[in-house]
Amino acid sequence: MTRRSAIRNAGKAVAFAGLSLKAPQASAQSVYGKRQVTALALTGDRYHNIDYVRTALGKTLVKDLGISIDFTDELSLLTAPNLKQYKLLIMLRDGMIWPGGYEGPGGRGAVVSDPPINKFDQTPVYWMTVEQGKAVKEFVQNGGGALFYHNVTYISPQNQEFRDVLGAVTREHPPLRPFKVKIVNKEHPITRGVNDFVVTDEQHFVKYEKDPKYILMESVNEDGLTWRDAGTSSVAGWAYDYGKGRVCYLAPGHVITALWNPEYEKIQRNAVKWALREI
C-alpha cells in the first residue's frame, strides 16, 4: 500500500467512525448537518496525547457504540453556551498547561541542542477557571451527563466546583505496572455482567468524597506493591445522579491497551448509555 492510499483509507475509516476531528463550531449541528453531536470530549495534555485518546474512544464509543463525538484539546471551548449543544461531556486530561514549554513528555533526560536553546520557564499553570468549573456543574445539574476518566482528579485541587461534581481528588499514582480492577457493585447497570480484569496502566489513587454506595470498582495491586501511604488499592470507579444529570468516573486510561481491555470496554459503553439515561 502506498503512503497516499494509506492516508486516503485512513480518512475513510475516520469518516465511517463518525468522528469530528475539527474543533466544535458555533453549532454542533454544523459538523454533521442536521444530526446533533452527542458528546464533547475534552482530552489531551502534556502526558496524554489527544491522538491515543481519540483513537481509543473512537473505536469503543463511536464505532462500536454509535455515538457522535466532537474531540478537542481547546480548553476555551469548555463554556456554558457550548456545553448546551451536547448531551454528554467526556474528559480525559489533567489540570495543568505548560505555556512556557517543557523538555519532553516526562521532562527526563539531558537536552542536547547545537547551538544551545535559551532556558525557558517549565512552570505549570492550572487552566480551569472558576467560570468553567461552574459551567460543568450547571451542565450536569441541568440534565447533562459527564463521563470522567483517569487523570481528571488532578483538576480538583484547584477548582472546587469541578471537584464537587467529580467527587474526588487525586492522591497521584505510581509508574505503569499491572493491577487488577475488581467490580464491587455487580448490580449497577454500568457493571452488570462485567468480570474483574487486569491491565497494565497507571494505577491512579484517589481520595473519594461521596457516599460509598456509589462505588462501582476498585483497583488492587495483587503483587503487594504499595503507593506511598495509600496501600495497594484505591477506589477506581463510581457513578451517581447529580441534580438532573449523571456523573461517572473511571480510573484506567493512560494507554490504549488499558482502554481497549474487553471488560473495560463494556464498562465504558455502559457508562455512556447510563449517563444518557438509555439504561
Question: Where are the predicted features?
Answer:
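Twin-arginine (Tat) signal peptide motif
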Residues: 1-7
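Short alpha-beta junction capping motif
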Residues: 38-42, 83-156, 244
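Catalytic beta-strand/loop cores that center a nucleophilic Ser/Cys/Thr
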Residues: 34-35, 62, 157-246, 251
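Solvent-exposed loop/turn segments at secondary-structure junctions
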Residues: 45-48, 75-77, 95-98, 152-156, ...
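Aromatic-Pro/Gly-enriched surface loop or interdomain linker
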Residues: 27-88, 95
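N-terminal export signals
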Residues: 7-28
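Extracellular ligand-binding/catalytic regions of CAZymes and related secreted enzymes
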Residues: 32-37, 62-63, 67, 110, ...
